[in-house]
């Protein structure tokens, strides 16, 4: 009998339905997700690729000789036993498993298609992002290349501490030099009180050039508390400062008693300093002939001016204590070289000589008194203008005084002299200051209607320096004469004598005072 071929393990028979399902699944897996509208050419290319994937890798074609060799080997193996055939069958099963693995590979092909799909969208965007990252920002390059201004300025500028140290050394050296120079001065006691010897009466320092106020260095104000050490510089200044008067024009110091005897005229530069109204009475009138008038008229608060920090009534009371006056003007009658006259003197130290309702009323009553008695009249002007705390009432005093002066000058036998001192501004300049029969002014007096600062702020123009001084205005014909303070009394007596006002002897003066007292 012929040996029968042993049958290996039978492969599972797959029904037609399962085969069709597998074919359908394979087709769907191979086709993958449908891409948006593709052209016919792309569709043909995809079909070609799918066919190759289905067929899988082509097996090499074996020739007839190789087939015969394989059959011969199988016959030899039959003689050896069934073990080899069973091994081959297992190998075939492994091959079947590999076929399943090929199906997995087909799934991998779909994954490759997904990667291709991702490359089309994501990779393109990513390349753009890379291009943006590769290009450096201009702002960053400019910021890195340009050095910071603060660093350059900081490197170029020297340290403040070094500069301050150098300045201190220079100041100390200057102080030592000045102290050595001042040791030889016989007025050494003067320099202990005022280290800067601008006002030193010694000949070595009298010819020293004056420095204008604008060019001088500002010195911080010192505390009013006196030091415990009586020999210290601060204590000397606080103890003896009330004995000296500082001249702003030449920065000189004048001893008060000497300055008063010279009618407040600076010894160094001859400038006319501000003068108290009581001192002017002593300057212009004969001794013991002054008789004040209308002292009972006092300032009230007619418009109830509101001020939280400094109420109007309190401010008036404080100026009364400081100056010893009841208002910004003193009015009365007296004798100048035995000539009986009426006189009014404004005081700038009382609220800047501002003209309020009481000031206007006193001047008006003085003018009316001179009109009734046919007396010559003198008004000394020193004012900053109308008093703002009284509003329109202070402005009305300009019209009231001008009206009284019009009645006074209607009589041709009387004579009105206006004396303008520094400063005379505002409503006083615009009213009785410029209505005199003769207008006199002191040297270098500041006379204007509006101040320099106000004009520059309102009109936006520059006011020339010196355009508001008495000398400049005299050249323009605004005044009749500029009279210094010392010969003022003699000049006034000549004017009165020239206009027919004769001097009276002592007996006539006594009778006149008895009748009109």
From Swiss-Prot:
<comment type="subunit">
    <text>Acetyl-CoA carboxylase is a heterohexamer composed of biotin carboxyl carrier protein, biotin carboxylase and 2 subunits each of ACCase subunit alpha and ACCase plastid-coded subunit beta (accD).</text>
</comment>
<comment type="pathway">
    <text>Lipid metabolism; malonyl-CoA biosynthesis; malonyl-CoA from acetyl-CoA: step 1/1.</text>
</comment>
<dbReference type="InterPro" id="IPR029045">
    <property type="entry name" value="ClpP/crotonase-like_dom_sf"/>
</dbReference>
<feature type="compositionally biased region" description="Basic and acidic residues">
    <location>
        <begin position="48"/>
        <end position="65"/>
    </location>
</feature>
<keyword id="KW-0863">Zinc-finger</keyword>
<keyword id="KW-0444">Lipid biosynthesis</keyword>
<keyword id="KW-0275">Fatty acid biosynthesis</keyword>
<feature type="binding site">
    <location>
        <position position="269"/>
    </location>
    <ligand>
        <name>Zn(2+)</name>
    </ligand>
</feature>
<feature type="region of interest" description="Disordered">
    <location>
        <begin position="204"/>
        <end position="234"/>
    </location>
</feature>
<dbReference type="InterPro" id="IPR011762">
    <property type="entry name" value="COA_CT_N"/>
</dbReference>
<keyword id="KW-0934">Plastid</keyword>
<feature type="region of interest" description="Disordered">
    <location>
        <begin position="1"/>
        <end position="179"/>
    </location>
</feature>
<feature type="compositionally biased region" description="Basic and acidic residues">
    <location>
        <begin position="24"/>
        <end position="41"/>
    </location>
</feature>
<keyword id="KW-0150">Chloroplast</keyword>
<keyword id="KW-0479">Metal-binding</keyword>
<feature type="compositionally biased region" description="Basic and acidic residues">
    <location>
        <begin position="132"/>
        <end position="179"/>
    </location>
</feature>
<keyword id="KW-0067">ATP-binding</keyword>
<feature type="binding site">
    <location>
        <position position="250"/>
    </location>
    <ligand>
        <name>Zn(2+)</name>
    </ligand>
</feature>
<comment type="similarity">
    <text>Belongs to the AccD/PCCB family.</text>
</comment>
<feature type="binding site">
    <location>
        <position position="266"/>
    </location>
    <ligand>
        <name>Zn(2+)</name>
    </ligand>
</feature>
<keyword id="KW-0443">Lipid metabolism</keyword>
<keyword id="KW-0808">Transferase</keyword>
<feature type="compositionally biased region" description="Acidic residues">
    <location>
        <begin position="87"/>
        <end position="131"/>
    </location>
</feature>
<feature type="compositionally biased region" description="Basic and acidic residues">
    <location>
        <begin position="72"/>
        <end position="81"/>
    </location>
</feature>
<feature type="compositionally biased region" description="Basic and acidic residues">
    <location>
        <begin position="209"/>
        <end position="229"/>
    </location>
</feature>
<dbReference type="GO" id="GO:0009317">
    <property type="term" value="C:acetyl-CoA carboxylase complex"/>
</dbReference>
<feature type="compositionally biased region" description="Basic and acidic residues">
    <location>
        <begin position="1"/>
        <end position="17"/>
    </location>
</feature>
<dbReference type="InterPro" id="IPR034733">
    <property type="entry name" value="AcCoA_carboxyl_beta"/>
</dbReference>
<dbReference type="GO" id="GO:0016743">
    <property type="term" value="F:carboxyl- or carbamoyltransferase activity"/>
</dbReference>
<keyword id="KW-0547">Nucleotide-binding</keyword>
<dbReference type="GO" id="GO:0005524">
    <property type="term" value="F:ATP binding"/>
</dbReference>
<feature type="zinc finger region" description="C4-type">
    <location>
        <begin position="247"/>
        <end position="269"/>
    </location>
</feature>
<dbReference type="GO" id="GO:0008270">
    <property type="term" value="F:zinc ion binding"/>
</dbReference>
<dbReference type="GO" id="GO:0009570">
    <property type="term" value="C:chloroplast stroma"/>
</dbReference>
<dbReference type="Pfam" id="PF01039">
    <property type="entry name" value="Carboxyl_trans"/>
</dbReference>
<keyword id="KW-0276">Fatty acid metabolism</keyword>
<feature type="binding site">
    <location>
        <position position="247"/>
    </location>
    <ligand>
        <name>Zn(2+)</name>
    </ligand>
</feature>
<dbReference type="GO" id="GO:0006633">
    <property type="term" value="P:fatty acid biosynthetic process"/>
</dbReference>
<dbReference type="InterPro" id="IPR000438">
    <property type="entry name" value="Acetyl_CoA_COase_Trfase_b_su"/>
</dbReference>
<dbReference type="GO" id="GO:2001295">
    <property type="term" value="P:malonyl-CoA biosynthetic process"/>
</dbReference>
<dbReference type="GO" id="GO:0003989">
    <property type="term" value="F:acetyl-CoA carboxylase activity"/>
</dbReference>
<feature type="domain" description="CoA carboxyltransferase N-terminal">
    <location>
        <begin position="243"/>
        <end position="514"/>
    </location>
</feature>
């Amino acid at each position: 009998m012929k040996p029968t071929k042993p049958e290996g393990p039978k492969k599972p028979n797959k029904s037609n339905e399962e085969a069709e399902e597998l074919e359908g699944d394979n087709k769907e897996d191979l086709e993958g997700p449908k891409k948006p509208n593709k052209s016919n050419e792309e569709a043909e290319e995809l079909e070609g690729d799918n066919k190759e994937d289905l067929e899988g890798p082509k097996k090499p074609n074996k020739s007839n000789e190789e087939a015969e060799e394989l059959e011969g080997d199988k016959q030899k193996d039959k003689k050896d036993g069934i073990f080899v055939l069973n091994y081959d069958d297992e190998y075939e099963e492994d091959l079947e498993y590999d076929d399943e693995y090929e199906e997995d590979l087909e799934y991998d092909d779909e994954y490759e298609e997904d990667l291709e799909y991702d490359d089309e969208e994501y990779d393109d965007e990513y390349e753009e992002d890379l291009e943006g990252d590769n290009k450096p920002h201009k702002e960053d390059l400019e910021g890195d290349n340009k050095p910071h201004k603060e660093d350059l300025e900081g490197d170029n500028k020297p340290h403040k501490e070094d500069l301050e140290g150098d300045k201190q050394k220079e100041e100390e050296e200057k102080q030592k030099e000045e102290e050595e120079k001042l040791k030889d001065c016989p007025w050494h006691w003067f320099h202990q009180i005022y280290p800067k010897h601008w006002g030193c009466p010694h000949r070595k320092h009298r010819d020293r050039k004056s420095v204008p106020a604008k060019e001088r260095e500002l010195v911080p104000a010192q505390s009013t508390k006196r030091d415990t050490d009586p020999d210290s510089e601060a204590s000397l200044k606080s103890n003896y400062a009330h004995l000296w008067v500082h001249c702003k024009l030449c920065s000189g110091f004048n001893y008060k008693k000497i300055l008063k005897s010279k009618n407040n005229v600076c010894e160094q530069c001859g400038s006319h300093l501000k003068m108290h109204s009581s001192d002017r009475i002593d300057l212009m009138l004969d001794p013991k002939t002054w008789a004040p008038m209308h002292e009972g008229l006092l300032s009230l608060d007619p418009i109830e001016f509101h001020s939280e920090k400094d109420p109007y009534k309190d401010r008036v009371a404080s100026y009364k204590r400081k100056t010893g006056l009841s208002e910004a003007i003193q009015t009365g009658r007296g004798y100048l070289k035995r000539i009986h006259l009426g006189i009014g003197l404004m005081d700038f130290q009382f609220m800047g000589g501002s003209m309020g309702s009481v000031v206007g009323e006193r001047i008006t009553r003085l003018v009316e008194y001179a009109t009734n008695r046919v007396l010559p009249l003198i008004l000394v002007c020193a004012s900053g203008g109308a008093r703002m705390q009284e509003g329109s009432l202070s402005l009305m005093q300009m019209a009231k005084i001008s009206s009284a002066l019009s009645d006074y000058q209607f009589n041709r036998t009387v004579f009105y002299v206006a004396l303008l001192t520094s400063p005379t501004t505002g409503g006083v300049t615009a009213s009785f200051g410029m209505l005199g029969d003769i207008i006199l002014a002191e040297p270098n007096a500041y006379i204007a209607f509006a101040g320099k600062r106000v004009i520059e702020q309102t009109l936006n123009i520059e006011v020339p320096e010196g355009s508001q001084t008495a000398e400049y205005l005299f050249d323009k014909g605004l005044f009749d004469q500029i009279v210094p303070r010392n010969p003022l009394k003699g000049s006034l007596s000549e004017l009165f004598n020239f206009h027919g006002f004769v001097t009276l002897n002592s007996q006539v003066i006594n009778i006149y005072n008895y009748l009109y007292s």
